[in-house]
Amino acid sequence: MSTTLSSSTYGKDNVKFLKVKKDPQNPKKQEVMEATVTCLLEGGFDTSYTEADNSSIVPTDTVKNTILVLAKTTEIWPIERFAAKLATHFVEKYSHVSGVSVKIVQDRWVKYAVDGKPHDHSFIHEGGEKRITDLYYKRSGDYKLSSAIKDLTVLKSTGSMFYGYNKCDFTTLQPTTDRILSTDVDATWVWDNKKIGSVYDIAKAADKGIFDNVYNQAREITLTTFALENSPSVQATMFNMATQILEKACSVYSVSYALPNKHYFLIDLKWKGLENDNELFYPSPHPNGLIKCTVVRKEKTKL
C-alpha cells in the first residue's frame, strides 16, 4: 500500500513557569504571572517522519528552553504579546519552519487586601479560572489570534426561567419561571487582523492596553449580564453577552461562548411533610446541557 504524509506538527506541551515583575521604584511591589505554554512547529520536517531523518528536527527540549529564556528576557504581559514573540522567534530563527502555534494559559492570581488596601506582593489564586490566548502564525504573515476566559464558575439562585420549549413524547422536563442557573464560562473572542495589523503590531496593541481592556470588558459583561438579566434561556443570555462585547470592542471580529448548563434538582421532601420552596437542591454531576454560539457583526449592506 502506498501512503503519504498529509500533515504534521510537533513541539513542547505543558511548559510551566511563574514570573515575578518588580516595580523599579519599589522592588517590594510586585506582579506575578503563572502560565502554561504549548508551542508547536510545522514546516520542512517531512523526512523525519517518512525517512527517519532527524536532521531537520528542532528538539522539543530546545523549544522548551526557548520558551523559558524568552520568558526571562522579554516582556510577557499580556500573554498575547508573549505568544507573538514566541511565534515570530521560531519563524525568524529556523528557515524551514513555516508555521507556529502557540497557546498560553494564565492562572488568575489576584492581590488581596490587608488593612483595606491590596498587599504589594501577596496573592489569592482564584479557583480554576484561566485567561488564554491562541496564536497561529505562518511565514507568509497570515495569523489568527484569539483570547479567552475559561472555567469561570458562576451560579445564581434565582433570576432564570425556561419555558415555551418544544415538547414531544420524549419530553419529561417541566417548565419553570424560577430556577438555579450555573455554568463554567468558556468565552473566546477572535481578533480582527485588519484592526490589529501584522503579527508584529500585536506588541503595539499590547502597549495601548487593548488586550487587557477587552479581557476586562468581556469578563465584566459576562458577570454583569449573568447577574442582572432575568434569563429566559442560556441561549438568549449568551447571545446578549457576545453582542455587548462586540459593541464595546471594535478590534474583535467574533465572540464565541460554550456554556454547560449545570443542573441543580429540587429535592422532594414531601414524604416528610415538608414543602421545598426552591431552598434545597441536589447538585447533579451529570449529565449537563451544553450550549454554544458564535456571534459576529453584520456586514454593512452596500448601496
From Swiss-Prot:
Coiled coil: none annotated. This is Uricase. Pfam families: Uricase. GO terms for cellular component: peroxisome. The active site is at residues 12, 60, 263. It catalyses: urate + O2 + H2O = 5-hydroxyisourate + H2O2. Its EC number is 1.7.3.3. Keywords: Oxidoreductase, Peroxisome, Purine metabolism. Urate binds at residues 60-61, 162, 179, 234-235, 261. The keyword Lipid metabolism does not apply. GO terms for biological process: purine nucleobase catabolic process; urate catabolic process. A motif (Microbody targeting signal) lies at residues 301-303. Catalyzes the oxidation of uric acid to 5-hydroxyisourate, which is further processed to form (S)-allantoin. Pathway: Purine metabolism; urate degradation; (S)-allantoin from urate: step 1/3. One of its GO terms (molecular function) is urate oxidase activity. Gene3D superfamilies: Urate Oxidase (3.10.270.10). Belongs to the uricase family. It is found in: Peroxisome. InterPro entries: Uricase, Uricase_CS.
